[in-house]
């Protein structure tokens, strides 16, 4: 696999070019990483309209992780969570009521920021009393998810998504296949914060 971004930045760092551009440290090493810290100079591509080395790197990552597409973000998973919810919200049922998201309670705070920014309600899926992992774990069973969806349906509300964190902060995994089947049966998208799961692709049976 090629490494187009690393190759470009290494060549630039070793070129001795006068840096008449941002950032202000001009590549002068203080912590050690500054020579590698550049902006959208010629050849460096542009993150949101990638056509060069970033596009090549994203294509490499797509093949590596076996995804349909891979896009790099400027703010890690928090930005990706907000983007995912924004896209899912576009398909929210137009009922005249505030959109509602069904979410496991161990969600990252980026979900709360998204709810404030995008103006939707959250209906929480709480951990079972016997779950010793408490909020850091919050496993969701097929039965609990089905019951929560049925309860919302009885109130005349259909969530625009079911939001889960898997793996969670303790390494626990949700049964994505089974929970996805429940969501499909109710016509509700399943949204997964998989920030801790990049390694899963490389395990037996990983995807």
Please tell me what each predicted stretch does.
Residues 1-52:
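N-terminal "arm"/small-domain region of PLP-dependent enzymes with the aminotransferase-like
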Residues 2-10, 56, 75-207:
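Conserved PLP-enzyme active-site core in the AAT-like
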Residues 22-26, 72, 142-144:
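Short acidic/polar alpha-helix capping motifs at helix-coil junctions
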Residues 34-79:
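Conserved N-terminal alpha-helix of the aminotransferase class I/II PLP-enzyme fold
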